[in-house]
Regions:
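Surface-exposed loop/turn motifs in large extracellular/passenger domains
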Residues: 1-254
Length: 254
């Protein structure tokens, strides 16, 4: 659904799954990394004449359609759903690209049952670098999750490992997280694992309910975690309601 896999090029723009592109993942076992709905996979920098050629521009990964997962799917590698970007990096060393713009999800995502290794839903950027702008999960991008992950669940406006600067990481949708998370839950305008970035704006404007059993940490709602050096401007805010339900368990930090 409008996704691009492994990229060896200086630019990639306009990976889009349109509003008519509804996706259903039913009874299936997938052993490879999978991308559903306006996603971009690995985009490593390449070497020409012994010199590293950086990806100059990664822009416009967008999902506008509803995506549903049934109860019998088992996905044994990373699974990206709804306007997500994986890695942008120089192979084996640093993660960077000159510019990464506009990672968007507008589509409602429902994951009910099933088992996932590592799951990213709704406007999530992986390991990036350079100048990163606009990683959004919009109001129509509601998320309902009631399944199991063996590792992390990232959802609704998350960016990781920003090397230079970032702006506007945000969630506007209402979200419910149930089930079991095998490691960490990150979501809703969250930025994490940052290295040497200079500025960022992070926000959550949706109502979030968590009833899940989370093995380690729970990082949700307009926040920065594990920041690096040279941080000279940060704006973190939350206007949505957050509910940690009676059934929720968090193994470490919230």
């Amino acid at each position: 659904g409008g996704s691009l896999g492994l990229l060896y090029a200086s630019q990639a723009t306009n990976m889009e799954n349109t509003a008519k592109g509804t996706v259903t993942v039913g009874k299936s076992t997938l052993d490879a990394i999978t991308f559903v709905g306006g996603c971009l996979g690995d985009a490593p920098a390449v070497k020409e004449d012994g010199k590293t050629k950086v990806n100059d521009l990664i822009e416009n990964c967008t999902n506008r359609a509803a995506i549903t997962h049934g109860g019998s799917c088992k996905i044994n590698q990373a699974h990206y759903v709804g306007g997500c970007l994986s890695y942008v990096h120089e192979v084996g060393t640093k993660y960077y690209a000159a510019k990464t713009n506009n990672i968007y999800n507008y589509g409602a995502v429902k994951v009910e049952g099933g088992e996932f290794y590592d799951l990213k839903i709704g406007g999530v950027s992986g390991y990036l670098g350079g100048t990163t702008t606009n990683t959004y999960n919009y109001e129509s991008g509601t998320i309902y999750f009631n399944a199991t992950t063996r590792r992390h669940l990232h959802f609704a406006g998350v960016a990781q490992a920003i090397k230079d600067s970032s702006t506007d990481i945000a969630n506007y949708a209402d979200i419910t997280i149930d089930g079991k998370i095998g490691h960490t839950l990150y979501g809703a305008g969250c930025i994490t694992l940052n290295n040497n970035y200079t500025r960022t704006r992070n926000s959550n404007h949706g109502d979030i309910t968590v009833n899940a059993e989370i093995a380690t940490n729970n990082f949700i709602g307009g926040l920065v975690y594990d920041s690096g050096a040279n941080l000279n401007y940060v704006d973190c805010h939350n206007t949505g309601n957050f509910t940690l339900g009676e059934k929720a368990k968090v193994g470490c930090q919230t």
